[in-house]
Swiss-Prot record:
Protein's cellular compartments: Cell envelope; Cell membrane
Enzyme Commission no: 3.4.21.-
This protein's record includes keyword NADP: no
Official protein name in the record: Serine protease Hip1
């Protein structure tokens, strides 16, 4: 959320929300901070055990389930310099109610999303048998949410300003303007966080943090559930500590071996497929704002959203009316649409939003965009957007070849026309990572984890954010089991599908992997 978004940044951001469960969790949890029960928890020191205390919420309207415990764990910022700077990881734990096997540690991905908020959501739907046998544990990765230091680059005003602008001018002057905004964003990150911390926020270090959490919980081996980009954390842990894994479920896979540009284009195709599926469903109903012919849905969609940009100057916004004084910008109309495409449970909200836009009103799409961008009713953002950029930029090599970026823009316009404004100009801005001040700590590679126990990768056939093939590829690399879900949402474990939950519960408790070809 934060800097001027190039097409590459927009596509990369599509991993933000993890399925219908996340949509529910966001409504319930929002941008709260969950901390230990004392008014001010002292920051822990290296080597200290976690001091667990009853959790409390910064939002009085959000009730934390009874028995939830919170604490912090100190880890070195740089594991090669354990006497240097320290980070404090925020944790939440829901104790097992029966004969405990160990801890089930979860992460929702993003990257940059709060594992504490995710645990609050998963706790509501966790099967009773799993709750009996495991402590449910969530953690905010280094730099994220309630962990300290947290990555902050933009102010709330910065985010509102950037969202208000169309971000579609790919003329030579427009590209220069976008890249100047990007450089200013990078400068804010360096000024506020320092290069040393930014150099150590990547998943390679988060995997080491995860092992420190395992040890602090008293577990000899890790039992882990990762959603979306949380699968990247899981596969990194499996590579670094294959002998310390008891069980691992990876749902909505990110393939560490994927070429970054090709992965982004596959994500773009996934969202175009989701848009097409939505349009076909909408067309069955009288009054569909995209009309009765799904083949014309993209054309009709652009007739609704393109007028939000001044046709004579694509850097000028012509926002739709909203009760909020901000209005609905073109950028937020696209983001609100993407938010609704994560799950069919949100399609009716997209229909409502597009129906409003017919009358130049934008309240529903703005609300969806605010949910996606993590802006609360008081105009405050959490730090997930800034954290996501910082993590992505050290997790993969930057694309600095402008010819490749221009070719990606051309291909993306063909693959995902609903997200594409105007015509191909033959120019495109470099993404944020091209200007990042520290080098990446990881490169695309196939996962190698000799001695790893059987794992379970869950992949959804029409997942808009993490394509099905990524799950197939990751399962092959891990030599694990592939569990297929036939659906259109992003991630599925512990979200109400009894078939999926039976398979993963049997695996978590007894180690029984799904049979070859298992499908729900």
């Amino acid at each position: 959320m934060g800097m001027r978004l190039s097409r590459r940044d927009k596509i990369a951001r599509m991993l933000l929300i993890w399925a219908a469960l996340a949509a529910v969790a966001l409504v319930l949890v929002g941008c709260i901070r969950v901390v230990g029960g004392r008014a001010r928890m002292a920051e822990p020191k290296l080597g200290q055990p976690v001091e667990w205390t009853p959790c409390r919420s910064s939002n009085p309207q959000v009730k934390i389930p009874g028995g939830a415990l919170c604490g912090k764990l100190a880890v070195p910022v740089d594991y090669d310099r354990p006497d240097g700077d320290v980070a404090a990881l925020a944790l939440i734990r829901f104790p097992a109610t029966g004969d405990k096997i160990g801890s089930l540690v979860i992460n929702p991905g993003g990257p940059g999303e709060s594992g504490i908020e995710a645990a609050l959501g998963v706790f509501q739907t966790l099967p009773k048998r799993v709750h009996e046998r495991f402590d449910l544990v969530g953690f905010d990765p280094r730099g994220v949410a309630s962990s300290r230091p947290a990555i902050w680059c933009n102010s709330d005003a910065d985010n509102d300003r950037l969202r208000a602008e169309p971000q579609v001018d790919y003329s030579r002057e427009g590209v220069a303007h976008i890249e100047n905004e990007t450089k200013q964003f990078v400068g804010r990150c360096v000024d506020k966080m320092g290069k040393n911390f930014l150099a150590h926020v990547g998943t390679v270090n988060v995997a080491k943090d995860l092992d420190a959490i395992r040890a602090a919980l008293g577990d000899d081996k890790l039992t882990y559930l990762g959603y979306s980009y949380g699968t990247r954390i899981g596969s990194a842990y499996a590579e670094e500590f294959p002998q310390r894994v008891r069980a691992m479920i990876l749902d909505g896979a990110v393939d560490p071996n994927a070429d970054p540009i090709e992965a982004e284009l596959r994500q773009a195709k996934g969202f175009q497929d989701a848009f097409n599926n939505y349009a076909a469903d909408c067309a069955k109903n009288a009054g569909c704002p995209l009309g009765a012919d799904p083949a014309k849905a993209v054309e009709v969609y652009h007739s609704l959203v393109d007028p939000l940009v001044d046709p004579d100057n694509p850097r000028i916004s012509r926002p739709a009316r909203t009760k909020d004084p901000r209005g609905l910008s073109y950028s937020d109309a696209i983001v609100g649409t993407i938010m609704a495409l994560y799950s069919p449970n949100l399609w009716q909200h997209l229909t409502d939003g597009l129906s409003e836009l017919v009358d130049n009103r934008g309240d529903t799409l703005l609300a969806l965009a605010d949910m996606y961008m993590r802006r609360d009713s008081h105009g405050r953002y959490n730090n997930s957007g800034d954290a996501r950029v910082a993590i992505n930029c050290v997790d993969q090599p930057p694309v600095t070849d402008r010819d490749k970026v221009i070719d990606e823009d051309r291909r993306a316009r063909e693959i995902a026309p609903f997200m594409s404004y105007g015509k191909f100009t033959g120019d495109a801005p470099l993404g944020t990572c091209a200007f990042w001040p520290v080098p990446p700590t990881s490169q695309p590679h196939a996962v190698s984890a000799p001695g790893l126990v059987p794992t379970v990768v869950v992949s959804t056939t029409h997942d808009p954010a993490t394509p099905y093939k990524a799950g197939v590829d990751l399962a092959n690399q891990l030599r694990g089991s592939l569990l297929t879900f036939d659906g259109t949402q992003h991630t599925v474990v512990f979200q109400g599908d009894s078939c999926i939950d039976e398979y993963v519960t049997a695996y978590l408790i007894g180690g029984t992997t799904p049979p070859s070809g298992a499908k729900c």
